[in-house]
Amino acid sequence: FAKTAKFVACGFDRLDRLPLAAEDRKKVVGNPVRSPIKAVRDKPYPELSDTGPLNILVTGGSQGARLFGEVIPQAIASLPEAQRARLTVVQQAREEQLEAVRAAYRAAGVKHTVDSFFSDMQDRLAAAHLVIARSGAGTVTELAVAGRPAILIPLGIAMDDHQTANAEGMVTGAAADVVPEPKFTAEMLAPLLLERISNAGVLKARAKAAWQLGNPNAARDLADLAEQAAGVTGKRDA
């Protein structure tokens, strides 16, 4: 189909298996995002210093919450006490893990909100200084549009390792770190996390880099491209 399509719209610059003959018709338009996420883009990155309060948002979805519930509390518990005292962690966890994850944070003296679902995710994202997440296309797109730095853990069983490909732009754009799932342990995460939360300047720079990668108008751009392909002219509601 790509060989005969007038345009090939894609969410990210990397598009594997695209026929060479269609390469010059590839158009990177991004992925549409919900209005509440676009609204986060217009809000400033939360105030942050090297020693002040820092908010971490952990979202894993059904394919990531179990691993995150095991590794992340353990990694955070191993941080120096002064760093743990700064943190507020908002974490999505599986229902059967909720009490264990909460208990781990209580024992570590870390302020936390742990639940299996958050209906106000846009508000949680707006308050976050750093996000730890999988790298599904929707998640990566929302992080970029919102302008939030991240530590991304691609789903190991994802077909063709497409979650690593999704994260590529955030990594090359200096907006995120990527940790392969087999290497995602508390012993590996703790020093990386400590390095990130100890330097407010780096997190702010990464937030700006993520923001610059985001396209809040992907839905409009895709519609424009469809109309162009169809030869439609004239005004259309935004």
Where are these regions (language model features)?
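A short, well-ordered alpha-helix in the C-terminal region of glycosyltransferases
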Residues: 202-216
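Donor-nucleotide binding loops and adjacent catalytic segments primarily
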Residues: 42-131, 164-168, 172, 179-189
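Short loop/helix-cap segments at secondary-structure boundaries that form the rim of catalytic
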Residues: 1-2, 15-23, 99-107, 124-125, ...
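Short alpha-helical segment that forms part of, or immediately flanks, the ligand-binding pocket
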Residues: 122, 140-148, 168
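Active-site-proximal region of nucleotide-activated glycan assembly enzymes
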Residues: 1-42
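Acidic donor-binding loop of glycosyltransferase active sites
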Residues: 126-140, 148-149
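Short hydrophobic beta-strand element within catalytic cores of glycosyltransferases
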Residues: 133, 149-160
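C-terminal alpha-helical cap of glycosyltransferases
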Residues: 215-238
